[in-house]
Amino acid sequence: TEIAEIQKRAVQLTIFFAILAIGLMALSPELVWILGGTQYESGKYVAIPLILSAFAVFIYNVVVPVEYFHEKTMYIMIGTAAAGVVDIVLNYIFIMRYGFIAAAYTTLVAYICYAVLHFFIARKLSGISILPFKVVCFIVVLLLCMAALNLVFISSVIIRYFACAVVVIPMGLLLLKRLFKEKNQNG
């Protein structure tokens, strides 16, 4: 069915974006150093939560078209405003105490709220999930574990790259296998 095809593509895109996010998290300290030099070295602690924020925005962009389709754009405005309020309140509480690094984490929390809210709104409106809940949960837990590992071992290139390879290679092979299988079935 058309819905099943959309769900399949959404899962494939989510896996692809997760692979990118995991790779970027592993590379982020070196990327910060290459792009900013030693004077921006503390930025390596901001990169990982910002990469996770980008993933949350990706999830939002996968599910929000359902709200447009059902012409319920008021929900988009409400969700955006709610996430903005969460971000402002958290920034007010944490930035003065913990500095600019806190801003990355408050942004992450706000974007997670944004994505979760719209995920459930879209599911309520359509009666189905564009992205299966179990898939999203698995990938989010995987990303959070990889983020924690990358932060704990931020000074160890070998551990970060090895962990990235252990996760990304099987995910990439699985995705490619599914894409080739699909291509062969469709001629």
For every predicted segment, state its role:
Residues V63-E71, F119-F133:
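Alpha-helical transmembrane segments
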Residues M74, T80-V116, L151-V166:
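Membrane-interface helix-loop junctions in multi-pass transport and translocation proteins
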Residues L31-L35, E67, F94, V109, ...:
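Hydrophobic alpha-helical interface/terminus motif in multipass membrane transporters
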Residues S42-G43, K72-Y75, F100, I128-P132, ...:
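Membrane-helix interface segments
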